[in-house]
C-alpha cells in the first residue's frame, strides 16, 4: 500500500542503506521498489511517479536486489511495480526501467512451502504474462521466444506444482521469470488493466491478482481473436504447447 511504501522509505532514510534487498512475493518486492524511489528522492510525489516512465534517475544512494519466493509476478526482473491505494480502492501500476532490480535471485527452494492456492493464483498470473506478451503489438522475436517457452512450461508443470511436486516448483519458478522477461519488453494487455482496476475495487477486500487474471483471460482471448493476427498467434501457442 501507499502507507507501507512511505513508512519503509522513512526507515530507509534513517539507516541509509547502499543496497536494498527485497525478499518475498510480488507485493513486498513491489513495495520495496517504490520505497527505493522515495528513499533516494524524499521530495518526489506519488502523483508524479504514477506517470509511466517518468522516474528520476535511481542508484544515487543504493542498488537493488530482489529475491522472489513465489512463482508469478516476476517482479524481480521487471520494470514494474503495483501499489494499492486502499483509501481510493485503486491499484497503481508503476512503470520505469529505473526500478528494474540490479540483481535477481531465483531460487526454487524458496517456493517449496507455497500453499496450493497461492501456487494456483501466481501460476495463472505467470501464464497471463506469457499470453499477453505473445499477442502484444509490441511483441518481437525475442519476447516471443520467452513467452512461448513460458506458456509450454506453465501448461505442463502448473498442475504438478499445485500438488507440491518439487521438480514442478522449480520449472514454474523459472517459467515465471522468463515470463517477466517477455512482458518487460513485449508489455501486457487488457487482462492486466482490468485485473488491476477491479482487484482493489471491493470494500470487503481485494480480488487476488492471479484470480482476477484467470477470470478475465478466457474472455479476453475471445475478444482479441477478432483480430486475425491475434487469432493466429493464439492458435500457434496452443499447438506449440501440444494442447491439440
At which residue positions do the language-model features occur?
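Glycine/threonine-rich beta-strand-loop-alpha-helix active-site module
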Residues: 3-10, 14-106
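General structural feature for long, well-ordered alpha-helical segments within catalytic domains
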Residues: 4-8, 16, 31, 123-126, ...
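Active-site pre-Tyr helix/loop in NAD(P)-dependent dehydrogenases
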Residues: 70, 130, 220
Amino acid at each position: 500500500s501507499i502507507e507501507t511504501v512511505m513508512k519503509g522509505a522513512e526507515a530507509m532514510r534513517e539507516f541509509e542503506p547502499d543496497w536494498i534487498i527485497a525478499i518475498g512475493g510480488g507485493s513486498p518486492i513491489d513495495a520495496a521498489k517504490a520505497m527505493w524511489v522515495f528513499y533516494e528522492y524524499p521530495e518526489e510525489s506519488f502523483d508524479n511517479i504514477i506517470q509511466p516512465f517518468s522516474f528520476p534517475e535511481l542508484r544515487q544512494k543504493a542498488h537493488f536486489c530482489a529475491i522472489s519466493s513465489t512463482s508469478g509476478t516476476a517482479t524481480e526482473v521487471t520494470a514494474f511495480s503495483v501499489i494499492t491505494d486502499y483509501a481510493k480502492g485503486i491499484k497503481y501500476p508503476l512503470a520505469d526501467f529505473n526500478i528494474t532490480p540490479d540483481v535477481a535471485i531465483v531460487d526454487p527452494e524458496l517456493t517449496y512451502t507455497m500453499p496450493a492456492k497461492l501456487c494456483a493464483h501466481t501460476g495463472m498470473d505467470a501464464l497471463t504474462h506469457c499470453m499477453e506478451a505473445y499477442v502484444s503489438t509490441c511483441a518481437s522475436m525475442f519476447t516471443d521466444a520467452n513467452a512461448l517457452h513460458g506458456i509450454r512450461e506453465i501448461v505442463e508443470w502448473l498442475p504438478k506444482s499445485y500438488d507440491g511436486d518439487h521438480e514442478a516448483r522449480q520449472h514454474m519458478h523459472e517459467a515465471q521469470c522468463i515470463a517477466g522477461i517477455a512482458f518487460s519488453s513485449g508489455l501486457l494487455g487488457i487482462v492486466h488493466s482490468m485485473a488491476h482496476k477491479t482487484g482493489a475495487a471491493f470494500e470487503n477486500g481485494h480480488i487476488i491478482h492471479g484470480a482476477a487474471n484467470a477470470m478475465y483471460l478466457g474472455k479476453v482471448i475471445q475478444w482479441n481473436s477478432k483480430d486475425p493476427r491475434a487469432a493466429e498467434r493464439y492458435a500457434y501457442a496452443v499447438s506449440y504447447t501440444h494442447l491439440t
